[in-house]
Amino acid sequence: MVVYLAFGLLYSVTTPLFEASDELWHYPFIKRLADGDGLPVQTPDQIGPWRQEGSQPPLYYALGALLTRWVDTSDMEVLRWINPHADIGVLTRDRNVNMVIHTERERWPFSGAALAVYLVRWMSVGLGAVTVLAAWLTARELAPGNRWLPLAAGAITAFNPMFLFVTASVNNDALVIALCAVCLWLMVRYVRGEPRPWHWALLGGLLGLASLSKASALGMLALAAATGAVVGWRTRHTPAGGWRALLVAGVGIAVPLVTIGGWWYYRNWLLYRDPLGLNAFVAIVGPRHPVPTLRQLLGEWQGFVMSYWAFFGGVNVAAPRWVYWALSLLGGAGLLGMALHVWRLVRARERD
């Protein structure tokens, strides 16, 4: 954990301001909330400096605003001097990769908007530490008594170059990943244990917070439902088991989830007639024409792999090719090991 924090802080102070993925758009959302201007209403004819990120659920931005509201950030537009010639999202020979033009305002000692950005970056590093801890706890739950597997799970999570890069920047992914990782750990515990009603309420509350961090967290609801189903099936021969356990799980999760996150999706419905707000998001960022086919998406597999492992800057600073090969081989070995482990478990159960 100490090594992760050291690397995370190093990434946070060496990555130039606004040169980390969509940090250029994430931070203005935080500044708007810190200035007391409230949540933006997204329209394609009035695009704010937060662009499409203003359509994102607001929890991460609200936390960043609370952390930095005391900082005078009136110099943000001077600091955020956009480079009109930057090659964003593509690899080019001219290497014009800087999304902004950098000035002396970024130098130590930090002040103004630069200080605010670094404070939020350090908050993200802390959230990354929560993710690493949750990975360690999940592996320990899955393999009790195994000293090395939890350590390996934490290390693989912590030292993924892209994970370090994202969790050392202003990015709501840092919060949603941390919350989902904790939820995953709890679900593994519940499958193996005997969860009580308050356990389900805790899971529902965390899922509600995750849904207020990024809409993609709603995908965790399928895992939560599966967890409740497994617990119900495993306890079906007990008085409080079976359908009763499934009902307790469903209500326990749904009530805090809707209470915490429901208002955001209702607001989206009122404003955009889309609970996820995706139509407003796409109207600003622009739709893809033509709609890609499955074959085209498979043809972009290399880009997906690169962006998972190490694709820095504005998705325009790549690592050497051998890095992707090495990391992909490591990931492939992990998948092979998982398949082998499952096969051994099945064989052991057949023998029993």
Language model: regions and residue ranges:
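Start-transfer (signal-anchor) and selected internal transmembrane alpha helices
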Residues: 1-9, 119, 127, 132, ...
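Short helix- or helix-capping micro-motifs
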Residues: 4, 153-158, 207, 211
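Interfacial juxtamembrane loops and adjacent helix segments
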Residues: 32-121, 286-288, 315-319
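Membrane-interface transmembrane helices that cradle and orient dolichyl/undecaprenyl
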Residues: 140-144, 183-199, 210, 232-234
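Perimembrane helix-loop-helix junctions
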Residues: 186, 192, 220-255
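Membrane-interface alpha helices of multi-pass inner-membrane proteins
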Residues: 199-215, 220-221
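Membrane-lumen/periplasm interface segments of multi-pass, membrane-embedded glycan/lipid transferases
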Residues: 269-348
